From Swiss-Prot:
PANTHER family xref list: 50S RIBOSOMAL PROTEIN L3, LARGE RIBOSOMAL SUBUNIT PROTEIN UL3C
Family indicated by similarity: Belongs to the universal ribosomal protein uL3 family.
Annotated InterPro entries: Ribosomal_uL3 (IPR000597), Ribosomal_uL3_bac/org-type (IPR019927), Ribosomal_uL3_CS (IPR019926), Transl_B-barrel_sf (IPR009000)
Xref: HAMAP family: Ribosomal_uL3_B
Organism ancestry: Bacteria, Pseudomonadati, Pseudomonadota, Gammaproteobacteria, Vibrionales
Alphabetic keyword roster: Methylation, Ribonucleoprotein, Ribosomal protein, RNA-binding, rRNA-binding
Assembly description: Part of the 50S ribosomal subunit. Forms a cluster with proteins L14 and L19.
Protein name according to UniProt: Large ribosomal subunit protein uL3
UniProt-recorded Gene Ontology molecular function terms: rRNA binding; structural constituent of ribosome
Post-translation changes: Methylated by PrmB.
Signal sequence annotation: none
Any one biological process term the GO annotation gives: translation
Length: 209
């Protein structure tokens, strides 16, 4: 399913003709350039590789420089892949713009969530706190028991405990596209999308639409 790589600009609001305020996230989509076309014969699956934005020449290593030169496209800030469905065809060097979503109403947006550092179980996993009084003096935000006794005699993998929170890949599904601004290469998406301002986001047609 083909999508676009964008950059989260921030949030604002737009008004409908009835005067209703809609909170929107602005996503800037610089032209996505196709840097490679993968086929069943050569790669075992069909996909396109795209790059977006630009990168300083002194930040492009030799492997990247050769790859982009072969494709005849400007070096971008990263490489992403989109799987192709039957019958879809693209050429190396082709550009994908926001007009791809002119007929799309709902999208899934993937980004890297804001990093929040080391957090306890209450903030990280929404554990309820223990009693604030009634003899409790040190364990207000402690997680409580983390297992049983001699059997099994260990803590199970995946146990929800304190640890690093955020800075992970997150997808928010079924967000509504409020406006497609082809002139300024902007997508206005209703509500919040994952990640910090300036972060890369992947916008795809919604799978559950």
């Amino acid at each position: 399913m083909i999508g676009l790589i964008g950059r989260k600009v921030g949030m604002t609001r737009v008004f409908t003709e009835e005067g209703v305020s809609i909170p929107v996230t602005v996503v800037e989509v610089e032209a996505n350039r196709v840097s490679q076309v993968k086929t069943l014969e050569t790669d075992g699956y069909a996909a396109i590789q795209v790059t977006a934005g630009s990168k300083k020449a002194n930040r492009v290593n030799k492997a990247e420089a050769g790859h982009f030169a072969k494709a005849g496209v400007e070096a971008g800030r990263g490489l992403w892949e989109f799987r192709l469905e039957n019958g879809e065809e693209f050429e190396v060097g082709a550009e994908l713009t926001v007009e791809l979503f002119n007929e799309t109403k709902k999208v899934d947006v993937t980004g890297t969530s804001k990093g929040k550092g080391f957090q306890g179980a209450v903030k990280r996993w929404n554990f309820r706190t223990q009693d604030m009084t009634h003899g409790n003096s040190l364990s207000h935000r402690a997680p409580g028991s983390i297992g049983q006794c001699q059997t099994p005699g260990r803590v199970f993998k995946g146990k929800k405990m304190a640890g690093h929170m955020g800075a992970e890949r997150v997808t928010t599904q079924n967000l509504e596209i409020v406006r497609v601004d082809a002139e300024r290469n902007l997508l206005l998406i209703k509500g919040a999308v994952p990640g910090a301002t300036g972060g890369n986001v992947i916008v795809k047609p919604a799978v559950k639409a």
